[in-house]
C-alpha cells in the first residue's frame, strides 16, 4: 500500500545518560583516601549514609518520566473518550437531516479542527474547544491538544498492519499570508499541506482541489467539488484512508445472495458473507440489541450493533454514549457462533460546517471569526466550508475505508447465529487507544 505523502511519519530520538555508581569497600585504597578525608566528629549518620547525588538525580528523573507516562496515558484516554462523545453527538445531528446510510470519521474531523484552532483566539477558540468536547483537556496548556493528537497519529503510522493514513489540506486564496508561527506549529503537530489557489477562477480551483484529493486518496474519492464560490478565502479538507483486513477473513465461497430487510415492509437481496468460528459478542436486554466484535489485523475492531427488531435502529442513537459502549465491551463473551454479514460499500460527503454550527461552533464561520493567530489579514478572513468525504467498503477480506475467556462448547451442539439482515450501526476503533476512527450505519447495503 502506498503511504500518502502528507501522512505524518514521526522520528523519535531519545538520549539516555548512563551514570555509573561506585561501591567502595573500606579495604580498598580508594576508600582509605576517601575515609581519611572525612571529619567523623562533625559527620552525622544521615550524611554518612547519604546516596550519591547523581543516583538521586537519576531516581528523580525516572520518577518524573513515570509521572509523564502516566499523565499522557490518562490524557490520551480522555481524548479518545471525548472524541467518541463528539462523534455520537455528530451522528445525532446528521440523523436529523439524513435517515439513510451514514459514514464519517470523528477522528479525522477532530484532527482538522484542532489544527485550525491553533490559528484562533478568544470566543472563536472557546467555541471550537466546547464543540469538540475538549474544553477540559485544553486547560492543561495551549499545545496539549495538538501534542495528544500527534501522539495518536504516531501510534497509527507506526502500526503498518493497521492500514490507516490521514491527512489534511488547507486551500487558501493566493493573496493570503500565513503567520510563520502558525505554519511551523501546524507542520510540527499535523503535517498539514497548504495549497495556494486563485478562488476567483473557480473552475481552475475546482480542478486543482479535486486533483489533489484524487492523488492523496488513491482514486477512492474522484470528485469532491462540483462547484466553488469565487468569493471563498479558505477551504479545509481532511481525508482518512483505512484498509483494514479481517483478523480471520470470510470465505468467499460461502457468500450467497440473501434477504436484507430494509423495514417491516420492504426487503432486497444482498451478497451475504458467512463464517463459523469463535466470535465475541453480547446482548443488551435493555435496548434489545446484539453487539458483535469483528476484529481487524493491526489491533482495530468493528463493533456491529444490531437491533432485535427491524424498525428500531434510529431510536438507539439517542442513547449512544461512551459509557454504554464501554458497558457492552465489559460484558462480552467469546463463543462459537455462526455469523452472516452483508458486503457493502458506503460513500458519503458532509458539509461539516453546517453540522458544526449546530454544535456551537458558529463564530469560526462568520465575519466575526478571530483568526489572528493564523494570519495578519485575519480581519477579512472566515472559514467558508469544512468538508469530509468518507468511503467504506466491506468484503470477505476486510474493510477499505477512506475518511475474554472462551466459553465451553458442548460437542455436536448447534452454534448460535447472528444474522445481520436488517439495518445496523457500526463503530470502528483502534483497540490500544480506543480512538473512534469511523462511525456510521447501514440502512441499505446496495446504496452508496
UniProtKB/Swiss-Prot annotation:
Site entry (Reactive bond), positions: 412-413
Region (Disordered): 33-70
Domain of life: Eukaryota
Site positions (Essential for interaction with PROZ): 265, 318
Modifications after synthesis and translation: Phosphorylated by FAM20C in the extracellular medium.
Effect ascribed to mutating residue 265 to A: 50-fold decrease in rates of factor Xa inhibition
CDD domains with a match to the protein in the record: serpinA10_PZI
Any one annotated GO CC term: extracellular space
Residues bearing glycans: 81, 184, 278, 299
Signal peptide, first to last residue: 1-21
Main location: secreted
Assigned keywords, A-Z: Blood coagulation, Glycoprotein, Hemostasis, Heparin-binding, Protease inhibitor, Secreted, Serine protease inhibitor, Signal
A GO term for molecular function: heparin binding
Disulfide-linked positions: none
Tissue: Detectable in liver, but not in heart, brain, spleen, lung, kidney, skeletal muscle or testes.
Coiled-coil features, chain-numbered ranges: none
Region Heparin-binding, annotated ranges: 140-157
Family indicated by similarity: Belongs to the serpin family.
General function of this protein: Inhibits activity of the coagulation protease factor Xa in the presence of PROZ, calcium and phospholipids. Also inhibits factor XIa in the absence of cofactors.
Name of the featured protein: Protein Z-dependent protease inhibitor
Organism in which the protein naturally occurs: Mus musculus (Mouse)
Annotated gene: Serpina10
